[in-house]
Amino acid sequence: MENKKSHYFYVLLCQDGSFYGGYTTEPERRLTEHNSGTGAKYTRLAKRRPVIMIHTEKFETRSEATKAEAAFKKLTRKQKEQYLKTFH
């Protein structure tokens, strides 16, 4: 039986009020990495931590998840807020 990995696009709310969008196969592990300062360069800055994972979307393929991440990163702040409201 094949054990398929799930792929996630996620959004963090940083301590400074900014959003960070990323990709992972393990959201809990990735959140721990971001909060410990070993995650993405963006979240390594102390002023951005701690971070809270405020959104996750599950995809079947890495390609779908990274496309969602790329699309989110192109949005303006206002558009990101609107996008997140559609899910919550």
From Swiss-Prot:
InterPro entries: GIY-YIG_endonuc, GIY-YIG_endonuc_sf, UPF0213_domain. Residues 5-82 form the GIY-YIG domain. It comes from the Bacteria. Pfam families: GIY-YIG. Signal peptide: none annotated. Belongs to the UPF0213 family. This is UPF0213 protein EF_2693. It comes from Enterococcus faecalis (strain ATCC 700802 / V583).
